[in-house]
Amino acid sequence: MAERRVTVGWPEGLHARPAAVFVRAATASGVPVTVARPDGEPVNAASMLSVLGLGVEGGQEVVLASAADDADIALDRLAKLVSEGLDELPGAV
């Protein structure tokens, strides 16, 4: 399973708008991705309610993971989005 540990770059954490940006990007990745606190259970990264339920604050670490064969590119892009607190997925049209 491919995995990336990243620090959340959005000051407000994975709440409201940043969570929506992240969920859209996870859905658009085309691979099943999970997100979790380092010591917590993973949740579906494409589920807004699940992501909000994590209660992740800015500056906290999360673990992105996927067992898909082609997960590395998707995880790298999502990790960049989360760590840099971007408003959209890098390379999005």
PLM features per residue range, with description:
Residues 1-10:
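Short amphipathic
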Residues 16-18, 74:
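Short acidic, gly/pro-rich beta-turn/loop elements at beta-sheet edges
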Residues 57-93:
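C-terminal structural segments of small proteins and small subunits
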Residues 20-23, 79:
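Predominant activation on well-ordered alpha-helical scaffold segments within soluble catalytic domains
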Residues 4, 44-46, 76:
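Hydrophobic alpha-helical context, especially transmembrane and signal-peptide helices
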Residues 14-16, 23-24, 29, 34-69:
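Amphipathic, hydrophobic secondary-structure cores in small proteins
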